[in-house]
Amino acid sequence: MKPENKLPVLDLISAEMKTVVNTLQPDLPSWPATGTIAEQRQYYTLERRFWNAGAPEMATRAYMVPTKYGQVETRLFCPQPDSPATLFYLHGGGFILGNLDTHDRIMRLLASYSQCTVIGIDYTLSPEARFPQAIEEIVAACCYFHQQAEDYQINMSRIGFAGDSAGAMLALASALWLRDKQIDCGKIAGVLLWYGLYGLRDSVTRRLLGGVWDGLTQQDLQMYEEAYLSNDADRESPYYCLFNNDLTREVPPCFIAGAEFDPLLDDSRLLYQTLAAHQQPCEFKLYPGTLHAFLHYSRMMKTADEALRDGAQFFTAQL
Protein backbone atom coordinates (compact mmCIF):
# COMPACT_ATOMS: atom_id res chain seq x y z
CA MET A 1 0.00 0.00 0.00
CA LYS A 2 1.32 3.42 -0.91
CA PRO A 3 2.14 5.15 2.42
CA GLU A 4 0.18 8.25 1.41
CA ASN A 5 -2.98 6.12 1.24
CA LYS A 6 -2.77 5.06 4.88
CA LEU A 7 -4.88 6.68 7.59
CA PRO A 8 -3.43 9.80 9.27
CA VAL A 9 -3.15 7.87 12.52
CA LEU A 10 -1.39 10.50 14.62
CA ASP A 11 -4.24 12.93 13.90
CA LEU A 12 -6.86 10.39 14.97
CA ILE A 13 -5.51 8.97 18.24
CA SER A 14 -6.92 10.02 21.61
CA ALA A 15 -5.67 13.02 23.57
CA GLU A 16 -3.97 10.83 26.17
CA MET A 17 -2.33 8.74 23.46
CA LYS A 18 -1.03 11.96 21.85
CA THR A 19 0.44 12.99 25.21
CA VAL A 20 2.39 9.73 25.30
CA VAL A 21 3.59 10.12 21.70
CA ASN A 22 4.77 13.67 22.45
CA THR A 23 6.49 12.80 25.73
CA LEU A 24 10.22 13.30 25.33
CA GLN A 25 12.94 11.79 27.49
CA PRO A 26 15.72 14.39 27.15
CA ASP A 27 18.45 12.08 28.44
CA LEU A 28 17.60 9.39 25.90
CA PRO A 29 19.50 9.23 22.59
CA SER A 30 17.67 8.65 19.33
CA TRP A 31 16.57 5.15 18.33
CA PRO A 32 19.57 3.28 16.81
CA ALA A 33 17.78 2.39 13.58
CA THR A 34 20.99 1.25 11.90
CA GLY A 35 22.51 -0.20 15.07
CA THR A 36 23.02 -3.81 16.01
CA ILE A 37 20.22 -5.80 17.58
CA ALA A 38 22.13 -5.68 20.87
CA GLU A 39 22.14 -1.86 20.72
CA GLN A 40 18.43 -1.79 19.93
CA ARG A 41 17.68 -4.10 22.86
CA GLN A 42 19.70 -1.89 25.18
CA TYR A 43 17.88 1.22 23.95
CA TYR A 44 14.48 -0.43 24.40
CA THR A 45 15.33 -1.34 28.00
CA LEU A 46 16.51 2.21 28.75
CA GLU A 47 13.47 3.80 27.10
CA ARG A 48 11.04 1.67 29.12
CA ARG A 49 12.53 2.64 32.50
CA PHE A 50 10.54 5.87 32.56
CA TRP A 51 7.29 4.07 31.82
CA ASN A 52 7.91 1.37 34.44
CA ALA A 53 8.39 3.78 37.34
CA GLY A 54 5.92 3.92 40.21
CA ALA A 55 4.65 0.35 39.96
CA PRO A 56 3.15 -1.37 43.03
CA GLU A 57 5.58 -2.87 45.51
CA MET A 58 5.14 -6.55 46.35
CA ALA A 59 7.14 -9.66 47.16
CA THR A 60 9.29 -10.47 44.13
CA ARG A 61 11.51 -13.49 43.56
CA ALA A 62 13.76 -14.52 40.68
CA TYR A 63 14.57 -18.09 39.68
CA MET A 64 16.50 -19.74 36.88
CA VAL A 65 14.50 -22.58 35.35
CA PRO A 66 16.05 -25.52 33.47
CA THR A 67 14.97 -26.24 29.89
CA LYS A 68 16.47 -28.42 27.18
CA TYR A 69 17.93 -25.25 25.70
CA GLY A 70 19.54 -24.11 28.94
CA GLN A 71 18.54 -21.94 31.88
CA VAL A 72 15.72 -19.40 31.49
CA GLU A 73 15.19 -16.56 33.93
CA THR A 74 11.79 -16.15 35.57
CA ARG A 75 10.44 -13.52 37.95
CA LEU A 76 7.61 -14.11 40.42
CA PHE A 77 5.35 -11.28 41.59
CA CYS A 78 3.40 -12.31 44.69
CA PRO A 79 0.73 -9.80 45.82
CA GLN A 80 -0.52 -12.07 48.62
CA PRO A 81 0.53 -15.36 50.24
CA ASP A 82 -2.67 -17.23 49.31
CA SER A 83 -2.93 -16.67 45.58
CA PRO A 84 -6.00 -18.25 43.92
CA ALA A 85 -4.05 -19.00 40.71
CA THR A 86 -0.82 -18.37 38.81
CA LEU A 87 -0.55 -16.29 35.63
CA PHE A 88 2.40 -16.73 33.28
CA TYR A 89 3.28 -13.51 31.47
CA LEU A 90 5.03 -13.37 28.08
CA HIS A 91 6.36 -9.97 27.05
CA GLY A 92 6.04 -8.45 23.61
CA GLY A 93 8.77 -6.96 21.44
CA GLY A 94 8.43 -8.61 18.04
CA PHE A 95 10.19 -11.76 19.32
CA ILE A 96 13.50 -9.85 19.11
CA LEU A 97 13.25 -7.22 21.89
CA GLY A 98 12.10 -7.03 25.49
CA ASN A 99 12.76 -8.70 28.81
CA LEU A 100 11.41 -8.89 32.33
CA ASP A 101 12.49 -5.31 33.06
CA THR A 102 10.78 -3.74 30.04
CA HIS A 103 7.41 -5.15 31.14
CA ASP A 104 7.87 -4.89 34.91
CA ARG A 105 5.05 -2.42 35.55
CA ILE A 106 2.59 -4.38 33.41
CA MET A 107 3.28 -7.56 35.39
CA ARG A 108 3.09 -5.79 38.75
CA LEU A 109 -0.23 -4.16 37.94
CA LEU A 110 -1.64 -7.42 36.63
CA ALA A 111 -0.60 -9.15 39.85
CA SER A 112 -2.05 -6.34 41.95
CA TYR A 113 -5.39 -6.20 40.12
CA SER A 114 -5.85 -9.97 39.96
CA GLN A 115 -4.31 -10.76 43.36
CA CYS A 116 -2.76 -13.76 41.63
CA THR A 117 0.89 -14.70 41.44
CA VAL A 118 2.32 -13.54 38.11
CA ILE A 119 5.39 -15.29 36.70
CA GLY A 120 7.27 -13.53 33.93
CA ILE A 121 9.25 -15.85 31.67
CA ASP A 122 12.31 -14.37 29.97
CA TYR A 123 12.19 -16.65 26.93
CA THR A 124 15.19 -16.57 24.58
CA LEU A 125 14.85 -13.90 21.92
CA SER A 126 15.16 -14.27 18.17
CA PRO A 127 17.10 -14.56 15.95
CA GLU A 128 19.28 -16.40 18.48
CA ALA A 129 16.33 -18.69 19.19
CA ARG A 130 14.13 -19.89 16.36
CA PHE A 131 10.56 -21.19 16.43
CA PRO A 132 9.41 -23.15 18.40
CA GLN A 133 12.14 -22.67 21.04
CA ALA A 134 10.37 -19.85 22.90
CA ILE A 135 7.17 -21.90 23.21
CA GLU A 136 9.10 -24.95 24.41
CA GLU A 137 10.88 -22.83 27.02
CA ILE A 138 7.56 -21.43 28.24
CA VAL A 139 6.06 -24.92 28.48
CA ALA A 140 9.16 -26.17 30.31
CA ALA A 141 8.85 -23.34 32.83
CA CYS A 142 5.18 -24.16 33.42
CA CYS A 143 6.01 -27.83 33.97
CA TYR A 144 8.85 -26.93 36.32
CA PHE A 145 6.70 -24.72 38.53
CA HIS A 146 3.88 -27.27 38.46
CA GLN A 147 6.25 -29.94 39.73
CA GLN A 148 7.86 -27.62 42.29
CA ALA A 149 4.72 -25.72 43.34
CA GLU A 150 4.95 -26.73 46.99
CA ASP A 151 8.61 -25.77 47.25
CA TYR A 152 7.96 -22.35 45.72
CA GLN A 153 4.70 -21.89 47.66
CA ILE A 154 2.62 -21.09 44.59
CA ASN A 155 -0.83 -22.28 43.55
CA MET A 156 -0.51 -24.21 40.30
CA SER A 157 -3.89 -25.93 40.47
CA ARG A 158 -5.25 -23.16 38.22
CA ILE A 159 -3.07 -21.24 35.80
CA GLY A 160 -3.35 -18.75 33.00
CA PHE A 161 -1.29 -17.21 30.24
CA ALA A 162 -1.07 -13.52 29.40
CA GLY A 163 0.90 -11.49 26.91
CA ASP A 164 1.06 -8.40 24.75
CA SER A 165 1.81 -8.27 21.02
CA ALA A 166 4.21 -11.13 20.17
CA GLY A 167 3.77 -12.24 23.77
CA ALA A 168 0.04 -12.65 23.14
CA MET A 169 0.79 -15.06 20.32
CA LEU A 170 3.17 -16.97 22.60
CA ALA A 171 0.54 -17.03 25.36
CA LEU A 172 -2.16 -18.60 23.20
CA ALA A 173 0.31 -20.84 21.36
CA SER A 174 1.58 -22.19 24.69
CA ALA A 175 -1.94 -22.91 25.91
CA LEU A 176 -2.74 -24.76 22.67
CA TRP A 177 0.58 -26.65 22.85
CA LEU A 178 -0.30 -27.92 26.34
CA ARG A 179 -3.77 -28.94 25.15
CA ASP A 180 -2.60 -30.67 21.98
CA LYS A 181 0.26 -32.55 23.63
CA GLN A 182 -1.83 -33.36 26.71
CA ILE A 183 0.65 -31.87 29.16
CA ASP A 184 -0.78 -31.26 32.63
CA CYS A 185 0.44 -28.06 34.26
CA GLY A 186 -2.77 -27.32 36.14
CA LYS A 187 -6.13 -26.25 34.76
CA ILE A 188 -5.81 -23.35 32.31
CA ALA A 189 -8.45 -20.98 33.63
CA GLY A 190 -7.92 -18.23 31.07
CA VAL A 191 -5.71 -16.54 28.51
CA LEU A 192 -5.29 -12.75 28.39
CA LEU A 193 -4.32 -11.37 24.99
CA TRP A 194 -3.51 -7.71 24.38
CA TYR A 195 -3.17 -6.65 20.71
CA GLY A 196 -1.54 -9.85 19.50
CA LEU A 197 -0.73 -11.28 16.09
CA TYR A 198 -2.17 -14.71 15.45
CA GLY A 199 -1.35 -15.63 11.86
CA LEU A 200 -2.84 -13.19 9.36
CA ARG A 201 -0.47 -12.29 6.54
CA ASP A 202 -2.60 -9.46 5.17
CA SER A 203 -5.67 -7.57 6.33
CA VAL A 204 -7.50 -4.26 6.05
CA THR A 205 -5.87 -2.90 9.20
CA ARG A 206 -2.42 -4.01 8.07
CA ARG A 207 -2.99 -2.01 4.88
CA LEU A 208 -4.47 1.12 6.46
CA LEU A 209 -2.32 1.35 9.59
CA GLY A 210 1.27 0.94 10.77
CA GLY A 211 4.19 3.35 10.49
CA VAL A 212 7.34 4.70 12.09
CA TRP A 213 5.35 5.58 15.23
CA ASP A 214 4.65 1.92 16.09
CA GLY A 215 7.33 -0.06 14.24
CA LEU A 216 4.67 -2.11 12.46
CA THR A 217 5.02 -1.37 8.77
CA GLN A 218 4.70 -4.37 6.49
CA GLN A 219 8.49 -4.40 6.23
CA ASP A 220 8.81 -4.40 10.03
CA LEU A 221 6.38 -7.29 10.38
CA GLN A 222 8.25 -9.27 7.75
CA MET A 223 11.54 -8.65 9.56
CA TYR A 224 10.14 -9.91 12.88
CA GLU A 225 8.77 -13.01 11.20
CA GLU A 226 12.04 -13.79 9.42
CA ALA A 227 13.94 -13.43 12.70
CA TYR A 228 11.53 -15.73 14.56
CA LEU A 229 10.84 -18.57 12.12
CA SER A 230 13.29 -21.28 11.10
CA ASN A 231 11.98 -21.75 7.55
CA ASP A 232 9.10 -20.92 5.22
CA ALA A 233 7.12 -23.99 6.28
CA ASP A 234 6.88 -22.62 9.83
CA ARG A 235 4.51 -19.91 8.57
CA GLU A 236 1.77 -22.54 8.38
CA SER A 237 2.52 -24.19 11.72
CA PRO A 238 -0.55 -24.27 14.00
CA TYR A 239 1.63 -22.72 16.70
CA TYR A 240 2.55 -19.71 14.55
CA CYS A 241 -0.51 -19.30 12.35
CA LEU A 242 -2.89 -20.07 15.18
CA PHE A 243 -5.82 -20.02 12.76
CA ASN A 244 -4.41 -23.31 11.45
CA ASN A 245 -4.93 -24.87 14.88
CA ASP A 246 -8.23 -26.35 16.06
CA LEU A 247 -10.07 -23.40 17.60
CA THR A 248 -13.39 -25.26 17.78
CA ARG A 249 -12.78 -27.18 21.01
CA GLU A 250 -11.24 -26.90 24.46
CA VAL A 251 -9.80 -23.43 24.00
CA PRO A 252 -9.39 -21.79 27.42
CA PRO A 253 -11.48 -18.66 28.01
CA CYS A 254 -9.81 -15.82 26.12
CA PHE A 255 -9.83 -12.09 26.84
CA ILE A 256 -8.93 -10.43 23.54
CA ALA A 257 -8.00 -6.75 23.64
CA GLY A 258 -7.62 -4.64 20.51
CA ALA A 259 -6.10 -1.20 19.96
CA GLU A 260 -8.13 0.93 17.54
CA PHE A 261 -5.21 2.13 15.41
CA ASP A 262 -3.14 -1.07 15.52
CA PRO A 263 -2.31 -2.74 12.19
CA LEU A 264 -2.70 -6.08 14.01
CA LEU A 265 -6.30 -5.31 15.04
CA ASP A 266 -7.82 -7.62 12.45
CA ASP A 267 -5.89 -10.54 13.96
CA SER A 268 -7.75 -9.95 17.23
CA ARG A 269 -11.10 -9.50 15.50
CA LEU A 270 -10.69 -12.71 13.51
CA LEU A 271 -9.62 -14.65 16.58
CA TYR A 272 -12.67 -13.44 18.49
CA GLN A 273 -15.08 -14.14 15.64
CA THR A 274 -13.64 -17.63 15.14
CA LEU A 275 -13.87 -18.56 18.81
CA ALA A 276 -17.34 -17.06 19.22
CA ALA A 277 -18.64 -18.88 16.13
CA HIS A 278 -17.65 -22.18 17.73
CA GLN A 279 -19.02 -21.38 21.19
CA GLN A 280 -15.58 -21.10 22.76
CA PRO A 281 -15.64 -18.75 25.79
CA CYS A 282 -14.19 -15.38 24.82
CA GLU A 283 -14.54 -11.65 25.21
CA PHE A 284 -13.35 -8.92 22.87
CA LYS A 285 -12.83 -5.32 23.87
CA LEU A 286 -11.65 -2.49 21.64
CA TYR A 287 -9.82 0.42 23.27
CA PRO A 288 -10.64 3.59 21.29
CA GLY A 289 -7.96 6.03 20.26
CA THR A 290 -5.05 3.75 21.11
CA LEU A 291 -1.92 2.62 19.31
CA HIS A 292 -0.23 -0.75 19.48
CA ALA A 293 1.76 -1.16 22.73
CA PHE A 294 -0.44 1.27 24.69
CA LEU A 295 -0.42 -1.10 27.68
CA HIS A 296 3.05 0.21 28.59
CA TYR A 297 1.80 3.72 29.26
CA SER A 298 -0.39 3.35 32.34
CA ARG A 299 1.61 6.12 34.06
CA MET A 300 -0.18 8.57 31.75
CA MET A 301 -3.04 6.66 30.16
CA LYS A 302 -6.16 5.74 32.07
CA THR A 303 -7.07 3.52 29.13
CA ALA A 304 -3.94 1.41 29.65
CA ASP A 305 -4.76 0.97 33.31
CA GLU A 306 -8.35 0.10 32.37
CA ALA A 307 -7.15 -2.54 29.91
CA LEU A 308 -5.04 -4.22 32.59
CA ARG A 309 -7.92 -4.12 35.07
CA ASP A 310 -10.26 -5.58 32.46
CA GLY A 311 -7.90 -8.48 31.80
CA ALA A 312 -7.39 -9.14 35.50
CA GLN A 313 -11.15 -9.05 36.12
CA PHE A 314 -11.80 -11.46 33.25
CA PHE A 315 -9.23 -13.90 34.62
CA THR A 316 -10.48 -13.84 38.21
CA ALA A 317 -14.05 -14.34 36.96
CA GLN A 318 -12.94 -17.71 35.53
CA LEU A 319 -11.61 -18.97 38.86
Curated annotation (Swiss-Prot):
Pfam families the record matches: Abhydrolase_3
Chain location of the short sequence motif Involved in the stabilization of the negatively charged intermediate by the formation of the oxyanion hole per the record: 91-93
Enzyme category, top tier: hydrolase
User: What EC number(s) does the entry state?
Assistant: 3.1.1.-
Tell me yes or no: is Membrane among this UniProt entry's keywords: no
Which keywords belong to this entry?
A: Cytoplasm, Hydrolase, Serine esterase
Checking NCBIfam families in the record gives:
PRK10162.1
Question: What is annotated about its quaternary structure and interactions?
Answer: Homodimer. Interacts with MalT and MelA.
Q: Which family does it belong to?
A: Belongs to the 'GDXG' lipolytic enzyme family.
Entry-linked PANTHER family:
AB HYDROLASE SUPERFAMILY PROTEIN C4A8.06C (PTHR48081), ALPHA_BETA HYDROLASE FOLD-3 DOMAIN-CONTAINING PROTEIN-RELATED (PTHR48081:SF8)
> What is this protein's name?
Acetyl esterase
